[in-house]
Structures are given as structure tokens and as C-alpha cells.
Amino acid sequence: RILGEVVGGVRDYGNRMGIPTIDGGVWFDDRYIGNPLVYVGCVGVMPRDLIEGDARPGDRIIAMGGRTGRDGIHGATFSSAELTDTHADEFSHAVQIGNAITEKVTLDAVLAARDHPDGCLFSSITDCGAGGFSSAVGEMGEKIGAAVRLDRAPLKYEGLSPVEVWISEAQERMVLAVPAENVEAIAAICDRHDVEWCDLGEFGTPDRELVLHWGDVEVGRIAMEFMHDGVPMPLREAVWDPEWAAREAGGDDVGVESMRAIGDVAGVFDMTATLLGHPNLASKAWIVRQYDHEVQGGSVVKPFVGPNAGPGDAAVIRPVPDRPRGLAIGHGLATGLARDPYVMGLAAIDECVRNMVCVGADPDRIAILDNFCWPGCDDPRNLGSLVRAAEACLDGGLA
């Protein structure tokens, strides 16, 4: 059921957002039965002159998109927590309730504001990911401060406290810094795309503070300098212990399991069927064929290639329809290859680069998208293994 829900979520959201799902991998391991790990990498293309932008004093804090609810509160905290029986109640609201259609029309409105005939209508923009409005406004107003009216945020239902509105990670929302003279044009675009929006306040305060109001009541005030730089960077000990890592490593090993099964099966054909029946070796076509890899019409090299539609490990899209340039996307997965995360990290990068070269990518122009999901790093040995993986990414990227 968990696998089916994950596949269904990727299928439905990607299609409705208009984002082709053209590459990926699946691996099964007993250690992830109750808590699956899903990585998502997404590549965006934008005008080079709009890559950087900062909120300016006097800019309005404009939120557009979905309404705010309790879903998603402490979502980032939950995803990093050690799961126990007590977390079911504590984090019951942590999972965000997504709405792909709302996010798609919000995306369309943002693009219309960016490509407006009079020029880009906003100074800066960010999403409401981990931390919701708190991280979005806190990051954008780091250098100049911000005054926020939380009671103006559209809510999914009544009864939310100022804290809940401030930290909810409910998706489908974007925060823009908009010059006051452009707010009317932003409103017209939102009305045209049927996107809800609100004015949450203003960037820029005299003392570079973050000030929060709920109606006539001030519910928060903190200096931006303290919020961003007031907590010293912690120093942690990292130790690489290969013997401990070998003992801790468990889970499924396709080779060992298959050899055990082969001992009980007579005949090479049955042996082959046993190997191919393992979920890590069996065809994933039933998953891949559910995904929309054609949306936008820019897919050139697709998930299944060749006369017999064999599976590929890299793909090519044409991101700008009127330009004859391709963008290759590939991946590498080296689970179980070794007990050393450095070796596995290098192997994954090596596999990914080879896959991309096979579809025509220039090795000198390959960029690595890496991410880390790791056991609690309060244990120096866990942190040591994380350092090993990071070193592999560095060495592999520079090789």
C-alpha cells in the first residue's frame, strides 16, 4: 500500500503540475518498510538576469496560492525525527495536504508576473517550505527586517493561532516582495488565474527587526541579526569507524538472498526466475508507465528506448521549445555496493555520469544534485559516515 501511494502521488502531482517524470530508480530494503525514503530532484530553467533578487525596503509582502492550515506544522522537524510509537499523536498534523491544481495555477500566475510586459513585477520570491511564512519572510527580510500582519493570511478553517499561521508548511503558497506600485498588477494577474492572494505587510523596519502582529496585538518581535547569527555554529565530533559501520549495516543483500534461494531450486531456468523475481531486479515498468514523461512535449530521450523499449537510466529533454539544445538528466544508485559511504558515493556519481554520457551529455557541463538523509548525528560515528559521503561528492565532482 505504501509503495502504491508513493507511486500514485508522483504520478498525479507531476502530471497536474505539467512536470515530466523522465528518470528515477526504486530500491527495496526491509529497513524502510514503515518509513519509505523518497528523493525528488527537479530542474528549472529561468532567465539568467533574474536569478538573483533581494527584497527592498517598502516592498509589500505578498502571499499567493493555497490557504494556510494546520497541515504541515513541524513537517521538517518530523521528517528529521527518530520515529517512535509516541510520534503518531505528536506529529499527526505534520504531513502536508497537497493540491496540485492550486500549485499549478499559482505557478502560472508567478510566471505571468515575471514575464509582464512592463518587466518583472516582484523584487524577490521564495516558497513556504520548511517553516512556512517564518522561513520565507525571515529569509527575504534578513537584511532589512519585516512587519507582518498574520491575521490577513487566508485560512483553510477557523481556530488557528498566530504561531500556527506563522510556521505552517502547508504547500502551494509563494511569498513575493512586490514594490507598492506593482501590487495592483499582481492582483489583476491573480484574478485572471483564479489565484488567491493577500498583503501580509511590508519589508523594511527601522531597527532591522522582524515584527509580527495579530490584529492590533503585537505577538512577536526579534532582531534579524539575532535570528540569523545569534546562535553559534555547533562544533560536533565526527569519527569514521569502519568496523562499527560493517556491524551496523544490515538490510537486504540481493546476492546473498538469491544464493540462498538458488540452493533450494533445481535447474538453471528456475535459478534465473528466482533472481529475476527479486523486487530489486524485477522490471519496474509497471511503475514507470504510470508516469507522464511527455507533458510539455519536450522529452527527446525517454525512459524506454531502443527497438524493444528497454529501460534507460538517463533521459534528455528540450527545455526551451524553439531552441535545439538538450538537457540530460540521469541518476546513480549504489545501495549495497559497499559498507563505506565514501565508496558508495563515488560509485553513485560514477554511474550517474556514465549514464548521462551515454545519452550525449558533455562531462564538463554536468552538475551534481546531492542530498543526505542520515541517522542522528549526535552519534559521532553516524556523523563520521556522513562526512565520508560528503567527501565522496566533493572528490567525485572534482574528478
What are these regions (language model features)?
Residues 1-399:
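Glycine/proline-enriched, intrinsically flexible loops and inter-domain linkers
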